[in-house]
């Protein structure tokens, strides 16, 4: 019998609170690059182990550190003066049952492939130095994956999720995803991948402040830069009408000095990421598992990216909590909003958490007894089928940042 708790949440519905703040760090932000590398390396190790053994050995690659390089962007060109240093750390298994694995090579290759796919104007071989210092784990750590039934939790920890997204949350995420989409880059090559979107809702007005690294070789002069910046404002303003009827005001690169006639007054980069010139990055300092940073919502400080998808509850429970919340809100009538918190105990099966706590805001006229059994059933089903989370992560079907 699982300890599933359903309680009514005595809290104002997200759309009715006076102030809401939402942030998303885009795929080219140094923290997001770190998240992406950590997760991609984990996926590559999973594939390596699966191909050889049919199962996944212990690993965690959630300790990626980016130390920024140096660059000299100029209108119409520029160059990298010092490459970006990327350090891969964590733990993995390089030998098991007489089989040796090329752990470091696979990790470095995965990191470089991610950079190639993600930062279009980055020359990975010339402009980055990728170093692997992933430690080699002991056989004792591997044993946990060989037990019968659900894997045992590797830690006493918790995961948090909620649903549905608010209008502001949806708009913030959609804005970054549009600006960093492949079709958009093809039409607007001057727009780099290092994009941060900060959303503020004050009552019925939403303000979006966007920091966007411009790629210097595609911007010939000050006038072209300003034209691209102003076009971005118009594009995002048009996008906003698809997600909200509220007033939306858009700002882009507010630190620019339009009185400057040279590059010094503008957000120019050679590669499209600030990691080239002074902005460091680490796993877990950016987006949560749902892709957002949401101080007005319950959040876990746990970094999901790079953690092993077999029994690391810091990853599994954060993803699972969001899936449960979405499922309940979409399929149980009468629930306006839901929070989910799942707590593990180290050594206990991950499908038997110490507590699976849910909190619901109900529609007017709906009572808790009208929905609690349905909520319990959905939570129980997800815990019973928790391996789906692992399978989706291993196959790269689930985003963790």
UniProtKB/Swiss-Prot annotation:
Source organism, top-level taxon: Archaea
Name the EC number(s).
2.5.1.6
* Residues annotated to bind ATP: 135-140
This protein's pathway reads: Amino-acid biosynthesis; S-adenosyl-L-methionine biosynthesis; S-adenosyl-L-methionine from L-methionine: step 1/1
Q: Which cofactor does it need?
A: Mg(2+)
In alphabetical order, the GO MF annotations are: ATP binding; magnesium ion binding; methionine adenosyltransferase activity
Task: Quickly give the catalysed reaction.
Answer: L-methionine + ATP + H2O = S-adenosyl-L-methionine + phosphate + diphosphate
Q: Which GO terms describe its biological process?
A: one-carbon metabolic process; S-adenosylmethionine biosynthetic process
Keywords, alphabetical: ATP-binding, Magnesium, Nucleotide-binding, One-carbon metabolism, Transferase
User: What role does this protein play?
Assistant: Catalyzes the formation of S-adenosylmethionine from methionine and ATP.
> Family, per the entry?
Belongs to the AdoMet synthase 2 family.
Q: What is this protein called?
A: S-adenosylmethionine synthase
Q: Which organism is it from?
A: Methanobrevibacter smithii (strain ATCC 35061 / DSM 861 / OCM 144 / PS)
